[in-house]
Amino acid sequence: MSAVVRPARSGDEADILGLIRALAAYEREPDAVVTTVEDLRAHLFADLPRVFAHVAEQDGRIVGIAIWFLNFSTWTGRHGIYLEDLFVDPAARGSGIALGLMQALAAEAEARDCARLEWAVLDWNELAKGFYRRLGARHNETWEPWRLDGAGLAALQRSAVGDALEATEATEASEAREGSRHPPEIAGMIDSS
């Protein structure tokens, strides 16, 4: 039986999470997934969602996922779709499910007037690279993906807060020395109230 590709709906979260975990295992990161069913429900089905999913359903079972979000190109002045995860259950592969999911995203891109559809692929995943080449996609050799997360992200956030706090403290100290933080013509009116 062929698969039906459709937007994810409430109630799909557990199946989606199962496929996310299977993808993580395939990508040699089986313990990396901390997302919960509740996280997926909160993000995929929020009043104004910022992440979306399409699923492929075969014989009443979800066997494929495409999880995506909108990004924006300042050069084209248009949104794009970034495909975060594409995965098909290995038992269901070879029946056009991945192609159907990508076609659904291409239709979303057209409906939303998006300039592009983009994603990242692991350097060792030759099977995926071959599939994407057959779609007509090309590897962008100019841009390298970079990421800041975990301790590095926290350290940057702390340094930004620290810098802002230092600047605020310096401003307050300067104002205290000068007696007012307001121009002389209005200082008396504001500082005395």
Model regions and ranges:
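A short beta-loop-alpha structural element at the N-terminal edge
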Residues: 4-16
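Conserved GNAT-fold acetyl-CoA-binding loop/helix
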Residues: 17-42
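A short helix-loop-beta-strand connector motif used in the catalytic cores of GNAT acetyltransferases and
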Residues: 42-55, 82
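Conserved beta-strand in the GNAT
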Residues: 55, 61-70
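Glycine-rich acyl-CoA binding loop
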Residues: 56, 94-102
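A short, internal acetyl-CoA/4′-phosphopantetheine-binding micro-motif in the GNAT/acyltransferase core
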Residues: 86-93
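Conserved active-site alpha-helix within GNAT-family acetyltransferase domains
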Residues: 99, 103, 123-142, 148
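Conserved GNAT acetyl-CoA-binding A-motif
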Residues: 110-120
